[in-house]
């Protein structure tokens, strides 16, 4: 079923991909954002919980709602990015499990207070956010993930009255290499991993 991707594909996804701090003044069409989600949705999550919820912030009005929640260091680049994705997670994700995981009563595993679902929601929602970054790169987009923002303000502006909470943000577009910092090091296998 599977075969290894070639070196060029691995470079595009990982080795030469960079976290972008600046983007070209080139719009990202809504059809490409839909194509992006249609890739992301196939990424695995525990019991197919798929708790992530995505808001693609593209309009000036929506950016203005987001702006007060951004840290100073993330403000200008986010306002200039063609798209900012709010990666959220739905604490009531289990309500969809009769459809998403029909061969057993998985909904019952998560019935009870929302706090009991938080760990599964944020863990699997974070997975889906990572899939979004890789899917964006696979489609020729560049990404700049960020955690410097006030989650309570984002939740009030975009998720008020819902069971959805914000997790992190990702700027998307076509990267401007002029805004890149020098490539930073990564930990070696021996520093970060072991075989047990």
Curated annotation (Swiss-Prot):
**Which keywords accompany this UniProt record?**
Flavoprotein, FMN, NAD, NADP, Oxidoreductase
| EC numbers, comma separated | 1.-.-.-
GO MF annotation: an example: oxidoreductase activity
Q: Which domain of life is it from?
A: Bacteria
InterPro entries, alphabetically? Nitroreductase (IPR029479), Nitroreductase-like (IPR000415), Nitroreductase_HadB/RutE (IPR050461), RutE-like (IPR023936)
Identify which cofactors the protein needs according to its UniProt entry.
FMN
> Which top class of enzyme applies to this chain?
oxidoreductase
Q: Which HAMAP family match?
A: Oxidoreductase_RutE_HadB
The record's similarity note reads:
Belongs to the nitroreductase family. HadB/RutE subfamily.
NCBIfam families named in the record: PRK05365.1
**Protein's name in the database:** Putative NADH dehydrogenase/NAD(P)H nitroreductase Smal_0358
Task: Specify the species.
Answer: Stenotrophomonas maltophilia (strain R551-3)
């Amino acid at each position: 079923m599977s075969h290894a991707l070639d070196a060029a594909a691995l470079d595009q996804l990982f080795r030469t991909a960079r976290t972008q701090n600046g983007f070209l003044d080139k719009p990202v069409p809504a059809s490409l954002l839909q194509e992006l989600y249609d890739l992301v949705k196939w990424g695995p999550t525990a019991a197919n919980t798929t708790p992530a919820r995505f808001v693609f912030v593209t309009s000036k009005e929506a950016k203005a709602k987001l702006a007060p929640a951004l840290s100073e260091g993330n403000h200008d680049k986010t306002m200039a990015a063609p798209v900012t994705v709010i990666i959220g997670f739905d604490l009531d994700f289990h309500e969809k499990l009769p459809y998403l995981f029909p061969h057993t009563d998985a909904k019952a595993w998560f019935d009870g207070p929302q706090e009991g679902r938080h760990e599964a929601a944020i863990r699997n929602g974070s997975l889906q956010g990572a899939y979004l970054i890789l899917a964006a790169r696979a489609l020729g987009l560049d990404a700049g993930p960020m955690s410097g923002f006030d989650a309570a303000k984002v939740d009030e502006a975009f998720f008020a009255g819902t069971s959805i909470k914000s997790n992190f943000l990702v700027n998307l577009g076509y990267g401007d290499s002029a805004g890149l910092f020098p490539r930073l090091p990564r930990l070696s296998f021996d520093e970060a991993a072991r075989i047990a």
